Every structure is written in structure tokens, then in C-alpha cells.
Amino acid sequence: MLNYNKNDVAPFPPMGWNSYDYYNTTVNEAQVRQNAEYMAKNLKKYGWEYVVIDIQWSDPDAGKQNKSGVQYIPFSRFCIDEFSRQIPAENRFPSSAGGLGFKPLADYIHSLGLKFGIHIMRGIPRFAAHEHLPIKTHDGTKITADMIANPYSISRWNPDMYGVKDCSYGQDYYDSCFELYAQWGVDFVKVDDICNTNMYPENPYSAEKEIEMIANAIENCGRQMVLSLSPGPAVIEKAHHYKNFANMWRITDDFWDDWKLLKAMFERCEVWQSHTGEGNWPDCDMLPMNVLGYGWGDMNSPENKGWKCKFTQEESRTMVTLWSIFRAPLMIGTDLPQLDDFSLSLLTNEEILAMNKNPLQAYQASSSCNENVVIWINECPDQKSYYECIFNLSDEVQTVKLNLKVGNHDNIRDLWERKDLGNCSEFVLEPHSCKALKISL
């Protein structure tokens, strides 16, 4: 791609929806369309734009062993094309029939003014290697999957793939995959088992060369795509490498509706705070809200409704506030058509979302007088105002007094309440709650 710069595709943290938190491995075309339609109608005007299909979209049997506690069916015969590349399962994505792949669905999502994303596991299908199935090469040389597969590079939690060797024909395989994704109209690719290859604790960044091959494949395919790496925790010593080749990288393992995980995120954000910027966004994972987990239940039971998000309203507000001021990617985890009014209000507060688009880095400035209170600050480019978010991480009510900068502070604005507070500088915070303020100098 002429004059390609991977930062251009994500000048701000990407905002969208991901199917995983609600649908697990089971999402189908009708459900993706319903979520896209909801986003276009209710969220697009606030900046939400990516519709991302998560793991196992090529497996026609995904979810059928949920009752047995099996998330990923061992050695499943998922769908591939003549070059060992995954293609959508037609029983779940009927518009893909006839070799069309995800193009009809991507075209529909684009027609709504949105962007389309998919999840892939790094590597090449194991059964393609076992059966010596062909791959597409740049020079027509007959190469089979086993010749580029690394059987010593596998996922700890998913049985589908072998890693790809760092070699010319390994690059050809990734080039051919992303050539296909470009033909489909893919705008966002989440690559899994690559940010931290946790099968190998002594070498958690063992897929470093595959990250480079995938980044090269995006550059070679002729279409801009956001590159998102999972799972975490990302390896801080490799921050420079993530920033050179990816747009997003997960700084945590899967994040769920558990206060302990949310509280721990403050420390992770502090570690990564100096590595945010144009095209480079440390990723706190999805925003779980409202209803979750339907795809983990019995798919044949009408009683399966998933579960209600366990976060309190205060905790949900704290989550969205931290992600926003830290400038993490914002990916909603739920079934959008079921969003309740409160959850929708979190996702459509333009004053909160503006923090996420602020071009300057935020930083954590913990209170020197109260270890239970964490403060995040982000200066505004006009040098006339700044954001200050105050978080009560304790289980007790806390009274917090602002340590205001020198100047006139007659305009302290509460971003969640959407009202000016005058020169008020003392706040009472309920457990696990926060205040998001914009302070004019």
C-alpha cells in the first residue's frame, strides 16, 4: 500500500461493538445485523462505528457442546477454502454461500455508515496441516499447510491452530488471508493468542514474528484495517513493538463484570499511561453491560437469557469513565437491542466521550492523603481547561477535596450530571463511584 501508515486508521481509540460478551462463539448473521441496525440508529452519531464478529465464526457447530462445558470444540472441522483460509459457516451466515464470504454482510454494514470487523486466531488450521492442504503462494510454488505450520506453537485455550513459521511462504499465507479479508471489506481485525501467548509463561511474547507478518499482510493487502491484539496482559517490555506494528493491544486478560477486575484495571492503566497516542491504544477489553453470557448457556433452552451484568450503576459509570479518560478503545459487550436506558445513557454522554478523543495523554495522580482515592487528569489542548476524574476504590464513603490549579475555577463542570458546579471543590463519593469533571482555568 503506497505510503501506508498504520496510525492513520486509528487516530483516536476505536469505538464499536463486539459479539463475544453476549454471544460467546455462537453469533449468527441475523444477530449481527440486528446489532448493527441498533448501532446505526442509536449510537452512530456519538462516534460508535465498528461491528466486530468475535471467535469461531467459521465453525458450524459452535455452541453445541455448551451443556458439557466445552467452549471450543476440540479439533472441530470448521470451514476453510481451497487455500486453507477460514471462511464463514454458511448455516450461521447464509449470505456467505457461493464463495461470497463476509462481503454481503460487510456491504450491508457499510451501507449503514458503519465499519466491519472480524476475529481470527493467529496461525493456520491444524487439520489443514495434518492433511497437507494447499496454501496460496506469490509465485505459484506448491506449498502445503504442514510446511509452514509450527506444531510447537499452539494456544493454551483454543485447539484450532498451529502457529505460522517466520518464512517467506508463511508470509504468503498471511498475505493470502488478508487479501481475502480486503475483498470482503473488513475494516478491523482482532487477532487472538498473540498479544500474550500464555501457553509459554517463560516467553509470553513468542508470537512476535507473527505480529510482524500480520502487520505486513495488512500493508500488502491494499486496504486499511485496524489491528487489535489479544489476549492480555500485554508485555510492557515490548511496548515499542506493539506500537510499531499494532493499533490496539490488550493490557488485561478477559475483563468481566467483577469489581475486583475493575479495581485492578487502575493499576494496569497506570503502567500503560505513557504509551497511548495516535494509532496506539492500550486496550482494557470490552465494556460489559446490561445483559451478558447468553452464548454460554444451553442454546436449545428457551429459558437461557444469559445473566444481568453484576456491576452496580456506580461501578458501570466508573468503568466508562476510566476507559474514557485513559483513552482506551471502547468496545461494547452486550446485545445492543436489549440495552436499558441507563446503559444507553453511559454510551451517549458526549461530554464523557470527548475525553476519549482528547489528543493529549492522561495520567494517574493518586491522592497523597487518601490511598482509597485515585485521580486521573488530562489537559486540554486549549490550555484553558483540563479533565479531572476522581474515583473512590474503597467500600466506604469518601469525602474528597480538589487540589485545584492556580486560577479562576468558577466553572467546574460535572460531566455525568451535565451541569456547572460553580466553584464547588469538595465531593462525597459513594463506594466504587466517581466524579468526572472539566475544570476551566
Model region roles, listed by residue range:
Residues D160-K165, D172, N220, Q224-D335:
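Glycan-recognition surfaces
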Residues T318-S366:
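Catalytic cores of secreted or luminal carbohydrate-active enzymes
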Residues L114-A129, A215, E219-I236:
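Aromatic-lined carbohydrate-recognition surfaces of secreted/lumenal glycan-active proteins
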Residues R317, W323-F326, M331-G333, C369-G407:
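Carbohydrate-binding surface patches
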Residues N423-L441:
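C-terminal beta-strand-rich structural cap/linker in extracellular carbohydrate-active enzymes
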